[in-house]
Amino acid sequence: MMFGFGLLKQYAGTTEQISTAAEALVGRSTTLTEALKAAAINVGRKPVETTDLAAIKEVEARAIGGDIESDGGVTAVASKAVARNQKIGEDNEKTNLGDVIAEIDVKVTRDREVTSEDAEAVIRAELNHSPFNNIIPGGVAESVTAAYKLNCNPCNVSL
């Protein structure tokens, strides 16, 4: 499903505005899993929430090209972390995004470059699960969008 770069324009800014997520990706492969690693660099100490889980699930499914394993992937790790975090009151005791993404190289065995469709889908997943209808600055959706921007640079697509 194409959205005509609408979400990318609205939530990611122009291609000239390289975010901290994009800066974290400079010199790295701009694949889906690298985008998750950039999110871990940017907001890795943030407790994992449902918003993150939805975005991670979308990234993992797109990286492997289909259905994700119910108990073996990074989505399963994120799901368990969210369930645990919902029971814990203190943020400093919660599982954070960096802990979940630390296992990505072992948990996700296939990967590919980020496309505009990937960025749109991850933004939509994060927005659909956000209680405030926004994406997390430096988070998964922004990092995937930054990876797309780097893959696209230089190109004549004006976001």
From Swiss-Prot:
Query: Sorted alphabetically, which InterPro entries does this protein's record hold?
Result: LEA_SMP (IPR042971), LEA_SMP_dom (IPR007011)
State a GO cellular component annotated for this protein: cytosol
Q: Where in the cell is it found?
A: Cytoplasm; Nucleus
Q: Which Pfam families match?
A: SMP (PF04927)
Task: Please give the superkingdom of this protein's source.
Answer: Eukaryota
Task: Describe the family membership recorded for this protein in Swiss-Prot or TrEMBL.
Answer: Belongs to the LEA type SMP family.
> PANTHER family given for it?
LATE EMBRYOGENESIS ABUNDANT PROTEIN 49-RELATED, SEED MATURATION FAMILY PROTEIN
The molecule here is called: Late embryogenesis abundant protein 50
Q: Which organism is it from?
A: Arabidopsis thaliana
